[in-house]
C-alpha cells in the first residue's frame, strides 16, 4: 500500500479552500448575460469554447492533491445540479464557494463547525420552502420561450424553437437536439409514431422521387417472430387483397421465400405490401409491438399466447390513416386505436418510469410515452464551424432541460432575485444557539452571491446593485443585459424554480461537508525518476554478468 500524506485542521482547510476557489473562479466567469467564454484545450482536435459551467468544471484537475480534493467536491456540486435539473451549474458553484468561504472564516474564528452546518441547513430548508411559495406555474408558450432564451444565454431564436417544439409535441413529448447541416437552426416535427427501422427491400418503394414507401389507409400485421415461409402469410394476404387495401408487415424479420414472394406480388401490382423489422430488442421489442398494437387497434400475433399466423384474420390487423417508410425510419400517422386504451398504456409506462432505477431505461420509456402521446421534435443546430456547433449545441441542451424544469415546478424571478427575496422572508430565523445563528446568517448572506457575480461579470459595482435589489420588493431586480432595474418577470428574466432549488440544495450539502472537514488524506506522489534509475541500474548489472 502506498504511503499517505495527511494534513490536519487549518492546514487542510486552507489547501481545500484554494482548490474550491480555483475551480469556482474558472466557472463563475460564465454567469449571466454578460458572462465570458472559457476555452478548453483538447488532446486532439480544436479547442472547445463554452459558457456551460459544468463543462468547465469537468475539465479541471489540479496538480496539488489536497487542492484537487477541494476542486473535485465543488465539481460534484455542478454535476449534481446538472443531473437533477440540467442547468444552474454555475449558480450552484457560486453558492457553494460563497458558503464555504464564509463558513471557513467562522471555523477559523473558533466556531463549532457542526453547529454552523446545522444553521446552514436550517436556513437552506427555509429558503427552499419560500422559493416554492414565490414560484408561479410556467404555462404559456411565451413563458417557455423566455426560460429557454435565458438558459441559452439570451439567444431568443433558441427560446422560440423550444417553445414551438413543446407546442407541437406537448410538454411530455420527446425533443432531441442534433447537429444541423446548414447555418440556420431548424425544427423538424415527426407527428405520429416513428421507429428506427426502414423497409426490408428497396423494391417496396412506390415514391421513387423521395425513395419512400407511402401507404394510405393500410392494414398493419404485427408478428413477434421471423417469417420465412410464405404459406403462413397467404390467408392474410388473400383477405387484404379482397379488401383492396395496402398492408404493412412489422415482424422480427421477413426473409427468404416470404420476402421474395412479397416483392414479386408488389411489383406485379397484385397486392400493395411493405415489410419492416420490429423496433427494439428482446423484451423491449415485445413492449413496443404492443404499443403499436394499441395505437392501431391491432393484435400482436404471438405464439407465446397461442396465436398462429396462419389463423390470423382481418380483425387481428391494426389500421392507420397513413404510413411513410424510408430506408431508416417508419412513421405511423393517425392510428385508429381507442384513445382511452392509449391513455391507459401511457399511464402504465409512466408508472414504470417512476419505478425504474436506470437512466437508460427511463429515457427509453420516456420515448415510448412520447411516441404514443404525440410525436417527436428534433431541433437541428446550425453553425459555421464545428467549434461553434459544439458550443451552441451545449447551450440548446441546457435551455431544453431548463424549460422542462420550468414546466415541472414553475418559475421564479431570474437574475439571482428569487434567492434574495426568499432569504429576505426568513431573516428572523433563529437557531438553537449562537453558533447556529452564525450559520443561518452566513447562508442567507451567501444568497446574494449569484446576483453579485452576474453584476461583476457585467462590469458594474456589485455592492451598490445588490443593496438596491435587496431594498426592492417582489420581482424588482437588475437586468444586467440592458443595465436597467425593473420587474424581472415582466422583462422576461425567469429561472425555473427547480433549477434554483437544486443549485441551492446541492451547494449547501457539499459546502456543509467541507466546513466540517478536520483531516485530509492523500497518496504521496511517486518518485518516478528514482524508479527509472533503479530499473536502469538493474539492466546494467545484468550486462555485467553476461561478460
Curated annotation (Swiss-Prot):
InterPro entries: Chaperonin_Cpn60_CS, Cpn60/GroEL, Cpn60/GroEL/TCP-1, GroEL-like_apical_dom_sf, GROEL-like_equatorial_sf, TCP-1-like_intermed_sf. SUPFAM superfamilies: GroEL apical domain-like (SSF52029), GroEL equatorial domain-like (SSF48592), GroEL-intermediate domain like (SSF54849). Keywords: ATP-binding, Chaperone, Cytoplasm, Isomerase, Nucleotide-binding. GO terms for molecular function: ATP binding; ATP-dependent protein folding chaperone; isomerase activity; unfolded protein binding. GO terms for cellular component: cytoplasm. ATP binds at residues 30-33, 51, 87-91, 415, 495. The keyword Nucleotide-binding applies. PROSITE patterns: CHAPERONINS_CPN60. Its EC number is 5.6.1.7. Forms a cylinder of 14 subunits composed of two heptameric rings stacked back-to-back. Interacts with the co-chaperonin GroES. Together with its co-chaperonin GroES, plays an essential role in assisting protein folding. The GroEL-GroES system forms a nano-cage that allows encapsulation of the non-native substrate proteins and provides a physical environment optimized to promote and accelerate protein folding. This is Chaperonin GroEL. The lineage of its organism: Bacteria, Pseudomonadati, Pseudomonadota, Gammaproteobacteria, Pasteurellales.
Amino acid at each position: 500500500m502506498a504511503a499517505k500524506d495527511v494534513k490536519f485542521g487549518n492546514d487542510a482547510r486552507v489547501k481545500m479552500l484554494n482548490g474550491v476557489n480555483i475551480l469556482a473562479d474558472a466557472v463563475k466567469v460564465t454567469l449571466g448575460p454578460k458572462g465570458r467564454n472559457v476555452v478548453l484545450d483538447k488532446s486532439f482536435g480544436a479547442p472547445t469554447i463554452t459558457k456551460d459551467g459544468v463543462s468547465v468544471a469537468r475539465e479541471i484537475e489540479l496538480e496539488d492533491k489536497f487542492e484537487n480534493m477541494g476542486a473535485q467536491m465543488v465539481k460534484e456540486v455542478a454535476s449534481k445540479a446538472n443531473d437533477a435539473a440540467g442547468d444552474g451549474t454555475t449558480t450552484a458553484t457560486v453558492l457553494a464557494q460563497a458558503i464555504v468561504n464564509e463558513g471557513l472564516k467562522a471555523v477559523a474564528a473558533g466556531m463549532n463547525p457542526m453547529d454552523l452546518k446545522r444553521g446552514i441547513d436550517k436556513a437552506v430548508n427555509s429558503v427552499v420552502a419560500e422559493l416554492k411559495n414565490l414560484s408561479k406555474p410556467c404555462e404559456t408558450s411565451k413563458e417557455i420561450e423566455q426560460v429557454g432564451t435565458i438558459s441559452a444565454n439570451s439567444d431568443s431564436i433558441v427560446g422560440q424553437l423550444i417553445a414551438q417544439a413543446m407546442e407541437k409535441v406537448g410538454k411530455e413529448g420527446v425533443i432531441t437536439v442534433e447537429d444541423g447541416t446548414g447555418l440556420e437552426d431548424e425544427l423538424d416535427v415527426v407527428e405520429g409514431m416513428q421507429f428506427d427501422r426502414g423497409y426490408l427491400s428497396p423494391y417496396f418503394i412506390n415514391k421513387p422521387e423521395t425513395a419512400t414507401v407511402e401507404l394510405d389507409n393500410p392494414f398493419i400485421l404485427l408478428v413477434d417472430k421471423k417469417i420465412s415461409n410464405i404459406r403462413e402469410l397467404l390467408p392474410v394476404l388473400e383477405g387484404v387483397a379482397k379488401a383492396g387495401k395496402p398492408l404493412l408487415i412489422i415482424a422480427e424479420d421477413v426473409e427468404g421465400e416470404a420476402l421474395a414472394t412479397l416483392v414479386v406480388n408488389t411489383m406485379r401490382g397484385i397486392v400493395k405490401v411493405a415489410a419492416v423489422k420490429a423496433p427494439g430488442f428482446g423484451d423491449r421489442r415485445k413492449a413496443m409491438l404492443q404499443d403499436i398494437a394499441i395505437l392501431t387497434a391491432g393484435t400482436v400475433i404471438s405464439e407465446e399466447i397461442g396465436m398462429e399466423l396462419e389463423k390470423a384474420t382481418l380483425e387481428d390487423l391494426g389500421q392507420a390513416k397513413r404510413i411513410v417508410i424510408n430506408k431508416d425510419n417508419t412513421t405511423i400517422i393517425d392510428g385508429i386505436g381507442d384513445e382511452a386504451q392509449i391513455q391507459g398504456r401511457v399511464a402504465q409506462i409512466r408508472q414504470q418510469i417512476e419505478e425504474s432505477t436506470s437512466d437508460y431505461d427511463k429515457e427509453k420509456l420516456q420515448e415510448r410515452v412520447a411516441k404514443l402521446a404525440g410525436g417527436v421534435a428534433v431541433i437541428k443546430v446550425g453553425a459555421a464551424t464545428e467549434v461553434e456547433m459544439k458550443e451552441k449545441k451545449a447551450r440548446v441542451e441546457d435551455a431544453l432541460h431548463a424549460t422542462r424544469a420550468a414546466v415541472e415546478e414553475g418559475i421564479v424571478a431570474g437574475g439571482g432575485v428569487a434567492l434574495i427575496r426568499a432569504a429576505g422572508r426568513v431573516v428572523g430565523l433563529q437557531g438553537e444557539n449562537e453558533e447556529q445563528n452564525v450559520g443561518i446568517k452566513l447562508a442567507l448572506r451567501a444568497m446574494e452571491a449569484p446576483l453579485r457575480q452576474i453584476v461583476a461579470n457585467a462590469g458594474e459595482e456589485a455592492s451598490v446593485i445588490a443593496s438596491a435589489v435587496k431594498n426592492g420588493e417582489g420581482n424588482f431586480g437588475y437586468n444586467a443585459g440592458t443595465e436597467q432595474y425593473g420587474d424581472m418577470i415582466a422583462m422576461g428574466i425567469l429561472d425555473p424554480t427547480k433549477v434554483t432549488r437544486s443549485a441551492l440544495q446541492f451547494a449547501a450539502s457539499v459546502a456543509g461537508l467541507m466546513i466540517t472537514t478536520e483531516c485530509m488524506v492523500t497518496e504521496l506522489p511517486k518518485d518516478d525518476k528514482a524508479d527509472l534509475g533503479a530499473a536502469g541500474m538493474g539492466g546494467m548489472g545484468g550486462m555485467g554478468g553476461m561478460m
